[in-house]
């Protein structure tokens, strides 16, 4: 069984929809203490920290049946700037005014940690193309509250999906977990 080291409801839903048996345990990692200039390296470091923190606390009497721990972290890169979750509505509106009509890259770091097999890590990238939007559309979306809880300030699987013109890459990666990557990593884990 997989243990998801994440508080993300979207990641949990992806695993449920894919019928992957799992449990959830939040890592408690202070993300503000982990830095890297390269956003690809940053998301992988964060994913590793989350998976490792949870894996190091496994108790066989409670966690029997856990064969691997999965950590993930996502950031959005627009015009060379890394966007995590917006701090507030004003920041979300400002970002959306910049992003409207443009495109950026959603990066998700993945780390699967398994006893005896070490860690399997990757950064999966998806290009997100945004529709041209009027200020009123942006304000209405931000007022919904949805963009305040997502890397980059948008949720593809929610209202934000209406504001996206297209994707180049993995759909589920934009939601926070690349299911194709996970399938391959789990297959490799089982073969190991």
Curated annotation (Swiss-Prot):
Does the keyword Cytoplasm belong to this entry?
A: yes
Question: What GO CC annotations are associated with the protein?
Answer: cytoplasm
Q: Which InterPro entries match?
A: ITPase-like_fam, Maf-like
**Which top class of enzyme applies to this chain?**
hydrolase
Q: Which reaction does it catalyse?
A: a ribonucleoside 5'-triphosphate + H2O = a ribonucleoside 5'-phosphate + diphosphate + H(+); a 2'-deoxyribonucleoside 5'-triphosphate + H2O = a 2'-deoxyribonucleoside 5'-phosphate + diphosphate + H(+)
Q: Please state where this protein is localized.
A: Cytoplasm
Which biological process annotations from GO are given for this protein?
Answer: nucleotide metabolic process
Q: Which Gene3D superfamilies match?
A: 3.90.950.10
Name the source's superkingdom.
Answer: Bacteria
Q: What is its main location?
A: cytoplasm
Coiled-coil stretches: none
Active-site residues, record numbering mapped to chain: 73 (proton acceptor)
Picking any one GO molecular function of the record gives: nucleoside triphosphate diphosphatase activity
Q: What is its EC number?
A: 3.6.1.9
Query: Keywords in UniProt for this one?
Result: Cytoplasm, Hydrolase, Nucleotide metabolism
Q: Which cofactors does this gene product need? A: a divalent metal cation
Q: Which CDD domains match?
A: Maf
What family does the entry list? Belongs to the Maf family.
In UniProt terms, what function does this protein have? Nucleoside triphosphate pyrophosphatase. May have a dual role in cell division arrest and in preventing the incorporation of modified nucleotides into cellular nucleic acids.
What PANTHER family does its record include? Answer: BIFUNCTIONAL DTTP/UTP PYROPHOSPHATASE/METHYLTRANSFERASE PROTEIN-RELATED, BIFUNCTIONAL DTTP_UTP PYROPHOSPHATASE_METHYLTRANSFERASE PROTEIN-RELATED
Q: What is this protein called?
A: Nucleoside triphosphate pyrophosphatase
Species of origin reads: Synechococcus sp. (strain CC9902)
């Amino acid at each position: 069984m997989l243990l998801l080291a994440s508080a993300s409801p979207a990641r949990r839903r992806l695993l449920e929809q894919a019928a992957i048996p799992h449990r959830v345990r939040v890592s408690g990692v202070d993300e503000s203490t982990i830095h890297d200039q390269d956003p690809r390296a940053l998301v992988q470091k964060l994913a590793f920290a989350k998976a490792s923190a949870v894996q190091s606390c496994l108790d066989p009497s409670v966690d029997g049946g856990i064969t691997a721990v999965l950590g993930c972290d996502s950031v959005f890169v627009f015009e060379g700037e890394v966007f995590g979750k917006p701090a507030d509505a004003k920041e979300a509106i400002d970002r959306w005014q910049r992003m409207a009509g443009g495109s950026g890259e959603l990066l998700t770091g993945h780390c699967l940690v398994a006893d005896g097999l070490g860690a399997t890590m990757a950064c999966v990238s998806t290009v997100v193309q945004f529709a041209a939007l009027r200020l009123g559309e942006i304000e209405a979306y931000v007022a919904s509250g949805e963009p305040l809880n997502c890397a980059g300030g948008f949720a593809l699987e929610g209202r934000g999906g209406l504001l996206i013109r297209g994707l180049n890459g993995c759909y589920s990666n934009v939601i926070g977990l690349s299911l194709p990557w996970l399938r391959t990593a789990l297959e490799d884990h089982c073969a190991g």
